[in-house]
Amino acid sequence: MTISKQQVVRWLDLAAEIFKEQQDFLTDLDREIGDADHGLNMNRGFQKVQEKLPGVADKDIGTIMKTTGMTLLSSIGGASGPLYGTFFIRSATSVMAKEELNLAELTQMLQNGVDGIVQRGKAEIGDKTMVDTWHGILESLNQEQETSFIDALDRAVAEAEKAMKGTIPLQAKKGRASYLGERSIGHQDPGATSTYLLFSALRSAAAQ
């Protein structure tokens, strides 16, 4: 099984709807340890992405991903714009001219994107950031390469949720939350949460 470029477009469309629905939830999380703008920023950025989708729906997956990244870079404020923008731009590098992706190609695409996040944000596993959720996703996908496409995504979603919730007892080492020191402990990281929501949308789109 593969994921088609039409399903990639559907993924981004679903993500826009999810970030619209979850704007207040993400902002409430960010109010505890950040600038209280993560939900607003993610919603605004992905609404702009959604507006661009009709213009790239017939393009290859790499072009779709790169356009998404450039749109997020120009429309999201705070730290999340550069990080998510970089994720999509770097993800595009291995999927230019691709019309569909198998599980290995999808995993490599996501790995390239996460490598970009790490290089840009300098976050490591355990720093209480979106990198924690991405690590859970990629570790799971790499272990499930012989599993069916949807089963592999299902297991990765479960690991993403575990990693997201795993940020609650951590002390933040990066971003605005790090200024709180030990007071950041006990709160779920907003970026780890938006990454979980984004990947959950990918799983949903792949099943359609």
Predicted regions and their residues:
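N-terminal loops that bind phosphate or other acidic moieties
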Residues: 1-208
